[in-house]
A protein has these predicted regions:
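Active-site regions of metal-assisted phosphoester/phosphodiester hydrolases
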Residues: 1-32, 41-43, 58-60, 66-67, ...
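A short beta-strand element within the Helicase C-terminal
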Residues: 37-38
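Glycosyltransferases and closely related glycan-assembly transferases
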Residues: 48-55
């Protein structure tokens, strides 16, 4: 079974130029796809429709913010403005809970062609779906978007498994509080089925082991920033008798790399679980 988690950044870079992120995800042929920063345009590009129309993937999309996606961006070769983390990027605009920066307002003025739509997270799979549930994680005070956990129960060759999709907050915005909420949801699940928890955690693996103990990493590879990665902040975590067959990360044009893990359930451990 192939699990892929990929932050698609709505299919544009930090200047609003189109990327091939969605095509890259589809080319990886996942059995389970955890998609952060999916885009559903009001009158244009719809990533969910593309996924379900061109593949056998089915699942759940959760809108976490209204946004504007720039469609006329241009800029230098770098993926986004050099100081984008301080002045804001120029590819996506979120205004529900925070004002745009002066630099963003100026760019919005001179690059008026934008597409409005919904920005969010998705969990899609080719496996039979037993149940799907969305757990709200709220919005942290410093955040410009809401957060949610998608909880799926799937059938893998006659065995039930849980798969959870998360796009976590940054540490500076209060991610420990968010991860405590995730831990409480996990603790309330049926303890028998093996679990996979995957997504863009915005958190390094050493810290994640402290904030979310008791998980095994099913894929270890640098995922951020996408062009010259030095850190892993996207993760595929497992509980239960998962066995990693292969794993890696690949550049699909986004600011994160796509992380994949080919995994199997250990037959002996599954039988002992009854």
């Amino acid at each position: 079974m192939r699990v892929v988690t990929f932050n698609l950044h709505a299919g544009v870079d930090g200047w609003g130029r189109p990327t091939g992120a969605l095509a890259h995800l589809i080319a990886l042929a996942p059995d389970i796809a955890i998609c952060s920063e999916l885009w559903r345009g009001d009158d244009g590009t719809d990533f969910v429709a593309t996924l379900t129309d061109t593949t056998n993937l089915r699942g759940q999309f959760v809108a976490l913010a209204r946004a504007e996606r720039v469609t006329t961006g241009h800029g230098p070769r770098r993926w986004q403005p050099l100081l984008a983390h301080f002045t804001g990027e120029r590819g996506l605009y979120f205004r529900e809970h925070r004002e745009l920066t002066p630099q963003q307002r100026e760019h919005r003025r001179v690059r008026p062609q934008v597409e409005t739509g919904e920005w969010g997270i998705g969990l899609f799979t080719t496996l039979p779906i037993e149940s799907l549930e969305v757990k709200s994680l709220g919005r942290l005070p410093r955040e410009k978007v809401r957060r949610a956990l998608i909880v799926a129960r799937l059938d893998l060759d006659g065995r039930s498994i849980h798969v959870l999709a998360l796009h976590g907050a940054h540490l500076s915005h209060g991610s420990p509080l968010l991860l405590r909420r995730v831990a409480r949801i996990v603790a309330a699940l049926d303890p028998v089925p093996p679990i996979i928890l995957a997504g863009d955690f915005n958190c390094w693996r050493p810290l994640l082991r402290v904030l979310l103990p008791g998980w095994n990493s099913l894929a270890r590879a640098r995922t951020w920033p996408g062009q010259h990665p030095h850190s892993q902040i996207d993760h595929i975590l497992g509980r239960g008798p998962w066995r990693r067959l292969d794993a890696g990360a690949s550049d699909g044009g986004s600011d994160h790399r796509a992380l994949r893990a080919d995994v199997a359930l250990d037959e002996l451990d599954v039988r002992t679980l009854g």
